[in-house]
From Swiss-Prot:
It comes from the Bacteria. The gene is rpmD. Keywords: Ribonucleoprotein, Ribosomal protein. GO terms for cellular component: ribonucleoprotein complex; ribosome. Part of the 50S ribosomal subunit. This is Large ribosomal subunit protein uL30. Disulfide bonds: none annotated.
Amino acid sequence: ANTVKVTLIKSTNGRLANHKAXVK
């Protein structure tokens, strides 16, 4: 379960980073 959580968090952070880059 912990591994899945970490993966989810990483993918979410990646999405946020992509969103910020696109907004810039």
